[in-house]
Amino acid sequence: MIGLVGRKVGMTRIFNEDGVSVPVTVIEIEANRVTQVKTLENDGYTAVQVTTGSKKANRVTKPEAGHFVKAGVEAGRGLWEFRTEGEEFTLGQEINVDIFADVKKVDVTGTSKGKGFQGGVKRWNFRTQDATHGNSLSHRVLGSIGQNQTPGRVFKGKKMAGHLGAERVTVQSLEVVRVDAERKLLLVKGSVPGAINGDVIVKPAVKA
């Protein structure tokens, strides 16, 4: 089963049958329109390419416009691809949120909020050094980043200050609380990566 592309609306809470408050993220999943079907013969692998939403005509490039016209669909806000295994799709086909009606858990992928350049304490949860007792300059610095002559360098991947966020993040096995096909909404328990109105990819959980 493939996934779908949606938009993070925000968080709220609902109450279950026992009156317990459940925190949920609301994901709006408009119809995903098939723009290309990739086959083993033509592309070397099988996949389906989809778009969703809409884009102003003056924001669509000529190659994109031709691609959408060939598929016979309205220009969307982006293109996403899902690998397929035996499923049959046709150009212009619409895939809706109701495909998750029988799914218990999903994996959600999004782009995390960008935090800019951050230090080791915020970026890697390093402990701070002494506030007093002779320490006047090094309260939030990293400390040692390696050895001396041997190896005489800083190892790749060393946790240091740098850009935090604005990267692809996947949260696995989120419980599906409700599928509202009429309003094109999917409610999942807990939080998902990214800012409000950000695009997210929802797939059935691989570890379910």
Curated annotation (Swiss-Prot):
The lineage of its organism: Bacteria, Pseudomonadati, Pseudomonadota, Gammaproteobacteria, Pasteurellales. This is Large ribosomal subunit protein uL3. HAMAP family: Ribosomal_uL3_B. GO terms for biological process: translation. It comes from Haemophilus influenzae (strain ATCC 51907 / DSM 11121 / KW20 / Rd). Gene3D superfamilies: 3.30.160.810, Translation factors. Methylated by PrmB. The gene is rplC. Keywords: Methylation, Ribonucleoprotein, Ribosomal protein, RNA-binding, rRNA-binding. The keyword Lipid biosynthesis does not apply. Belongs to the universal ribosomal protein uL3 family.
